[in-house]
Amino acid sequence: MRTSTQEAVLSAYIASIGKRTPREAAQDAAELCRLATSLNRLNEIACNSGLTERQERRKQNLQTRIKVVLERAGLVLNHFESDPRGYAVYLDLPDGSCNSFGGRECGYGIGR
């Protein structure tokens, strides 16, 4: 799924929760997609050659930053995925929507 589509879907869900204004929701969605894409890139590097200590710290920092943005936006993290063939971050959306073969249990993926 294209990032702009992911951003639009996330922005709509964040705004529907009511904790953020539409503008803040759009900013949160863009930041989440950007962070998740960076995390996915590190997953690709880890798969191909392994991560350096610096890259490991960056991965941890990205995961922490994603959790902060999710909490601020009112969304719930399902899990982080380290397999670079799929999405890097899976969320539990309020209506149970999903966009992967894992179904509702897996959640809605971003960051590919």
Give, region by region, the residue ranges found by the protein language model:
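Acidic, low-complexity, intrinsically disordered interaction modules
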Residues: C33-G50, R54-I110
